[in-house]
């Protein structure tokens, strides 16, 4: 999930990193500055290494956004909570419902950030799409969505 969000924010022109490694999470937390933002993603919200990294980042003055269930230790440490509640999975510790809910929240967050950043973000996304088209990604099957609520942008092609 974090890698997906990192890639999306990067395409919008934001500096973002995703760290799964415990030690790199700690270093990333220590490297934060006042005004920095850490987005912590965990459905269960209780992994000690992630909680430690969040504490370190907050100690440096960073704000913490958490994508997690509302009743978790991570939620309690967040400055901004994107609380996600899904029923427990009968088989998996974290089931497909949780995965899809987190992915949907990441998509919504990406759209909101793009809208907030305005035209420069739209231009970056269009350049990325053009790069995909040049290298054989199936762009014709997946038309570019308009960020201004105007529907599908066909780039002058008939849809």
List the predicted regions and their residue ranges.
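Glycine-rich phosphate-binding loops that contact phosphosugars or nucleotide phosphates
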Residues: 1-104, 108-115
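Internal, active-site/partner-interface "lid" segment
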Residues: 116-158
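Structured catalytic/translocation cores of nucleotide/phosphate-coupled proteins
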Residues: 69, 158-159
